[in-house]
Regions:
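Hydrophobic mid-bilayer segments of alpha-helices in multi-pass membrane transport proteins
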Residues: 21-33, 40-61, 83-89, 244-253, ...
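Transmembrane alpha-helical segments and their short flanking loops
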Residues: 184-194, 222-251, 272, 276-294, ...
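C-terminal transmembrane helix pair
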Residues: 188-208, 350-462
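Hydrophobic transmembrane alpha-helices that form the pore/transport pathway of multi-pass ion
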Residues: 114-202, 362-404
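Short juxtamembrane and helix-loop transition motifs at transmembrane-helix boundaries
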Residues: 97-107, 125-126, 223-235, 397-401
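Interfacial loop-to-helix junctions that mark the boundaries of transmembrane helices
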Residues: 36-46, 74-77, 109-114, 231-242, ...
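Transmembrane-helix bundle segments that line or gate the permeation/cavity pathway
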Residues: 165, 170-173, 177, 208-223
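Membrane-embedded alpha-helical segments and adjacent helix-loop junctions characteristic
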Residues: 64-150, 301-385
Length: 462
């Protein structure tokens, strides 16, 4: 009897030590990620170091090393399916610059801006461009930079305009057929991308309308004093700007409406842009090959050269590496049941509004801990999927809820690269967060929607 009591106590102490060592390792990983982001280091380095720390910790706790690698590999397989799409998106970004598509979108788009409603116009324009490009970073670094330069020249508060630009940039990052995060979530939840996008649009209307009203009143109080800048004047000097160069973007738009497979859509758009780059913009085949692989760069010391740069296969290799390491890392964390205590907190939740509120909390904490949008998505999925299955929620509901929480909340965490990088590109700081209205209205309105339906159902049965 005494012997059994001692064994039980030792077992409990051992479990407590194991839990403490896991928490210490996770905290250390968080600090490493945070330092990496604030210092501007490539996040894959900190993720790789975090992976080593967790492998050592769990091996010390008694998990077979081979089993840990298997957990990570099985999880990372989900990332492999979107690597091709990521690489194609990288090519699209660079080749659209070389073909004149992105310069034309910036040039024509800014022509429609009303000085009196500049902030509202900036939000709407970045929404449109982000849907076409499918990347928040690409939108911010092209049309976003042009708008910020115009805003600063017109004496508009940079935090307000940055908030409108970043909110608009994540409109497309959330619901564009070219969005890497949308593809990742569809892959994780085993759902159809186009069905997801249709559902996302239905949950976006009220937050979008409310955001436009807010930006309308902000525009009235902050009219721009100047609407032209050298940046826009440079575009037609360097590129042949005409409606023909918009064909790659139009191809994506119409092929997506026809629900053509995304890889085929991107490949067709790339082929059209390649033709335009060679025969309209007069680049050589070798130059276009370099653009496809290494990204687009203007060899001049101008503001346009700073704004129009990037893309290419190489740029997406870095992103792909982050996605693979992140999924590997999360696979080990989930496989070792390190966060089992967190999952227990959700067991008593049964209402849709309560479940969505839990997803918001998990998405926010994951965004704060992971420091990247990718980790926020992966951790939210892994922590919430069992509860959604338990409540007999469809995979589509889980996909939409992740889009409406982790995806849009990540940019609102000051040290998460989803918001830190766009803010840095726009030469501002976390002061943009209160003005990124659309990003926090998405989860708020969706929670209100769930709550409203529940209250109506309660009244029916009273």
């Amino acid at each position: 009897m005494f012997f059994n009591s001692v064994i039980n106590k030792l077992f409990i102490i051992g479990k407590e030590i194991q839990t403490m060592s896991s928490l210490f390792s996770l905290t250390l990983c968080f600090v490493i990620l945070l330092v990496s982001v604030t210092k501007g280091y490539f996040v894959a380095y900190s993720l790789g170091l975090s992976l080593v720390i967790l492998l050592v910790t769990f091996t010390y706790q008694g998990f077979p090393f081979a089993s840990l690698l298997k957990m990570g590999y099985i999880s990372s397989q989900k990332a492999f399916s979107i690597i091709t799409i990521l690489l194609l998106i990288g090519v699209v970004t660079s080749i659209w610059m070389a073909s004149g598509t992105i310069p034309a979108l910036v040039y024509y788009g800014t022509q429609f801006i009303n000085p009196q409603y500049f902030i509202l116009s900036a939000f709407l324009l970045t929404c449109i461009i982000s849907v076409l490009l499918g990347t928040s970073f690409g939108t911010v670094s092209t049309v976003g930079v042009a708008l910020m330069i115009m805003a600063k020249e017109g004496n508009i508060d940079p935090h307000i305009i940055a908030g409108a630009i970043i909110a608009g940039a994540y409109f497309g990052d959330r619901c564009s057929p070219m969005s890497s995060s949308a593809h990742l979530i569809a892959s994780l939840t085993k759902t159809n991308l186009y069905k997801n996008l249709a559902y996302l649009m239905t949950t976006a209307w009220f937050p979008f309308i409310a955001s436009t009203i807010v930006y309308f009143f902000l525009s009235l109080g902050n009219p721009i004093q100047a609407t032209s800048h050298n940046l826009l004047a440079e575009i037609p000097q360097i590129f042949d700007i005409n409606f023909l160069v918009l064909c790659p973007a139009l191809a994506v738009f119409f092929l997506c409406l026809m629900k053509i497979e995304v890889k085929v859509t991107l490949a067709i758009s790339i082929a059209i842009a390649l033709f335009l780059g060679i025969f309209v913009q007069n680049y050589s085949w070798l130059q276009m090959f370099q653009v496809i692989v290494f990204g687009f760069h203007l060899h001049s010391q101008t503001q346009l050269a700073e704004a129009l740069t990037g893309g290419g296969i190489v740029s997406m290799l870095r992103v792909s590496l982050v996605v693979i390491i992140s999924t590997f890392l999360v696979g080990i964390i989930v496989g070792t049941k390190t966060l089992a205590s967190v999952e227990k907190l959700f067991r008593r939740i049964s209402s849709k509004s309560g479940l969505f509120l839990s997803t918001i909390a998990v998405g926010l904490v994951s965004a704060a801990f992971g420091c990247t949008q990718t980790l926020a998505i992966l951790m939210t999925y892994q922590l919430m999927k069992d509860k959604y299955e338990q409540e007999k929620m469809s995979h589509y509901q889980l996909a939409i809820d992740i889009e409406n929480t982790a995806v849009v909340l990540a940019p609102l965490v000051p040290w998460n690269i989803a918001g830190l990088v766009p803010a840095t590109v726009l030469m501002t700081d976390s002061g943009f967060i209160p003005y990124a209205v659309y990003l926090y209205l998405i989860p708020v309105f969706n929670w209100i929607g769930f709550k409203f339906v529940e209250l109506r159902m309660q009244r029916k049965f009273e």
